[in-house]
Amino acid sequence: MEVIHGRPHCCRNLEGADILSNTFYSNGLHTPYETTIRPTASQARYQELREALPQCRLRWGADREYGGVLPVSLPEEHRPKCEPPRLMSKGHQHYGFGGEIWPKKLPIEQYYYMTQNKKSDVYGNDSLLPKPPNSAVKEICSPYPIEHPYHTHISRGSVFPTFTSPKDLYTGIKARTQQPFPPTVPTKACDTTILKTRGNPYRYELLDFPMDSKKKALTWPGQGVYYDFPKFVEKNKPVFYPKPPKTFAPNSSVNPWDTMSSAKDANIQRNLERSHWLTSYAHDFTGLGPMSPLELDDYHEKELAELTGQIGFDPQPQEKFHPALKTPRPLDGRIARLTQNQRPLEATVQIPPPCPDCTPRVLCAFHTFIPTSAEIMAMNNNLLSGITHKNQDVEEKIKEEQGLMSTCPLPTCYESKDLTSLYDVQSFPKITDTKKTDDLYWRQLEMKPLPISCSKSNHYIDYEPLKSAYRDPYAMCPNPVRLSKSNILQNKTDTADFTFDNFLSKPEFLGMNMESNEETRPLLDWIPRAGVPKHHSNLRNLRNTFSKSMAQKRLHNSIQEEQKDLRDKLQCGMRHQFFGYNGHHFYN
């Protein structure tokens, strides 16, 4: 850019920067969304623009000064004949910031609705400082919101939260409208009037106890916010508020901030609060296990109590159901069919033991010798001496017929059943009503185990001595192939004196195995095994001989060693060193 000569009032410097600033620098990296290319797209383009568009040089800040290029100010009597050229001058007035200190005209209209700023209501215009005549701000004689004086010492919420609702029947809005108040609604304290003359040493107080119909319900101040007044208002005394239990909505019944649909929901909330009063011990240990869920909705019962005139009907929440212990019932059998409302099975004649030679209608010669019920009754009523010999003959004949005709293997000892005890009519009382399942069940439990006699072989000796069945009638009888030697010898000595009476009164009993042994199955229906006593095991004697304390004593005696003395100087093994010294130095 060329310098224009002939202008002494202009400086010889060019305005502008030789380097393009990043503010005006634009390309695809800095302005990716710029659609049109500006003339200052690059450094080369900027230099080209400076050369193509020459600019006039400006004076030394003439346009930026508050003065300017002005004619020379001289008095009229001293002015020259020809007008001198204009010179740079600022004049004799100092304008400062170039404007008036206080505006003399009306304030400029500001449209604040177009922006988010708001105009101040205190000052007349939007200036930051008021005018000198209005600078004296007066006190506002109006209450202003404050916090409670003890706000830092009061919890915001309840320390022990409650479930009380504004629609509660006993502490809500309905209870506060009743006169007189119920005992569950607190009331305000009585008004106190203090009569004290200045200078008088005595203090007089007048207490006004209003009637119950004129009492007012207790309400804590500061439900919304606390207000304070200047000291010159209300006899120059500040307002002191009582300390509420909480700062956030202290009166739940005055301002129903929670939405409640009906009084039924309020009753449920109150019962829910009372359910939390139960201790964990009372909840877990009720005598019948843990407590069942509580019935919180008893609004219908309370409405009925109110209609019937019951006063103070407010029971504790009760359990929805109580656990009960039921006696176990068998899954199969006659009792199970009766409890399931099924048709009971018909009583059938007991089928004799299976035999290959027997048919469903004709029995083999072996099973035809089993005594009938008439013979059993005769034996029970008429105890004759000849029956004993007849019974021995029957047994011998049974053995012979079984060995000749039957193909079944003959056991070592044939088990003959004590049919007298099976058909004892007096032990089973008659029950006409078959639907009384409990009587049938307990009759089966009261049955004693059916004894079965056994005639022993004289050629077998057992090597395991067991208890005799004569002394323990409820013990299970040993297996017929494991009879004791003492019993055999005793039977040999009593063979001469053996009678049918002794045979019925002192039999050797066999255990009744209803699952595996078919010949010992009774001729009655199914009998539960709950009342059948079990045999005594020989392990009980071994268990009684064991003593835990003696075993521990023997263990300690076996591992007891001689106590070592730390004062002894050990030449071998582990040394007893303490802080570099042997232990015997500390005991000398």
UniProtKB/Swiss-Prot annotation:
Protein's recorded name: Sperm-associated microtubule inner protein 4
Gene: Spmip4
Keywords for this protein: Cell projection, Cilium, Cytoplasm, Cytoskeleton, Flagellum, Phosphoprotein
Disruption phenotype: The testis size, weight and histology, spermatogenesis, and sperm morphology and motility are normal in homozygous knockout males.
Tissue: Predominantly expressed in the testes.
Modified residues annotated as Phosphotyrosine in this record: Y441
Modified residues (Phosphoserine): S406, S421, S427, S457, S484, S516
One GO cellular component, as annotated: centrosome
Localization, UniProt: Cytoplasm, Cytoskeleton, Microtubule organizing center, Centrosome; Cytoplasm, Cytoskeleton, Flagellum axoneme
Function noted in UniProt: Microtubule inner protein (MIP) part of the dynein-decorated doublet microtubules (DMTs) in flagellum axoneme. May serve to reinforce and thus stabilize the microtubule structure in the sperm flagella.
Domain of life of the source: Eukaryota
Main location: cytoplasm
Residues modified to Phosphothreonine: T219
InterPro entries, sorted: SPMIP4
